[in-house]
Each structure stands twice: as C-alpha cells, then as structure tokens.
Amino acid sequence: MNFISKISLGAKVFYAESLEKLLSNMSVAKPTIMTAVPRFYQNLYTKILLSFSKQKGFKKKLIENTILIGKKNLNKEKLSFKQKIINFLCEILVRRKIKNQFGGKLKAFVSGGGALDKQIGEFLNSIGLPTLQGYGLTETSPVVSCNIPGKIKIETVGPPFKTNEVKISEDGEILVKGENIMLGYWKMKKETDNIIKNGWLHTGDIGEFTKDGNLKITDRKKEIIVNLGGDNISQSKIENLLCLYEKIKQS
C-alpha cells in the first residue's frame, strides 16, 4: 500500500541494491525523499564519522564548525556575525558536497520503525542531510505523525497528521483514532477487540506530547523493566546508546 500510494501521487519509487551501493544508486535516482529504519542511519553516521576523522588541518576545522553551527541552526539558536560567515563557507565547502553525494535533490531522510538516537539525528541535520522522525504502524496505514522540514524536533516524531486523532491514556500508552485505522485483523476477532477499544487503537507504545504539540515516543509498553526498587528502566535507551559503538551492530 505504501508503494502504491506514492505512485498514485506521481512519484517514482527506487530501492537501493545494498548499503555498499547506496551512493551510486542515489546518484542515479536523485531522490527527494528517502525512508529507512534507524539502523541504516546508525551505519551511515558511523561511516561519515570515520571519513571525517581522517581529515586534518583546515578541512578538520571546517568540518567541526559545520557540525557545531549546524546544530545551532537546527535548534534555532541565534548566530553571531562571525558564525554566519563561517556557516556560509560551511554550506558551500562541506554541506553542498555532501548533498551532491546523495543525488543533490534530497529534501529529507525519514526514519521510522524504531527510535532514532538524538545524537545521530542532530549530526545528520548539521551536515546538510535533513533527517526527520516519523511514527506509524501497519494498523494505522501506516503513518500517524512526522516531523516537518524546517520545524524539526529530533527527539520527537512530529505532530499527528490531520487524518487521525491521538491521545495518551492514563498509563501513558499512545492511542490513535481516525480514518486510517484498520478495520481489524482478518478472521481474528479476539485479537482485534484487544487492540481496538471504542474506536481507539492501542499502539503498545508509551509516549507524551511536548509543549509545541509534537508527539514523543518514550518506550514500548512491554519493554519497560521494573526493578526491585520500583524504578522503570527503558531497554531501548540503553540499546540505542550501545549501537553508537562501531563494533556493535545490534543490541
């Protein structure tokens, strides 16, 4: 359905052959939007960092400023006159070259299917690769919310789409209601009744709304560990931190 919906809007859909051939594939496809799971962006982050670590002198300093000022831009922080000049140089000498490596027309990377580490999201945005987090399930056809280019809040999955209504239950679970919700599982009434109650789909995800109306996923309902002291411990946060290490691919 996701594939067909894009074609119906007049878009062309390309699939990368492999991670190793990604850049060559993108130079041919020249995508405007690319979607992938967080692990892809973790691998991309590691590879770019490795490439940056080999630079010395002026190039190294330029890259450091690109990341530093890029993060300030992302967080809407005010730049000094000197930083504006440096940022202009970074845009021409660093970000533009990186964008061209990915086809030159990329408007956004969209991450879904799991939590994207904030450090990775900030880094990719800072070097000229707009990276958004989205949220959805197969049962919601599939997108519930997504960040908006120019208004990116990395730690959130953006505001809910107008096609659905989202609320947080008393125990913190994200509930979704709208025309995009499935009718039910095929010939599985019991399972359907367990997940859809009074028109609300119980996602199994724990979340909250930020002050600006963005949805923030904090954990999976079934993946929270309660220790002997009664503390709630998030497995996913620990797993994401472990995956930042080059030698750890999955945790």
Where are the regions that the model predicts?
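C-terminal boundary motif of the adenylate-forming
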Residues: 206, 245-251
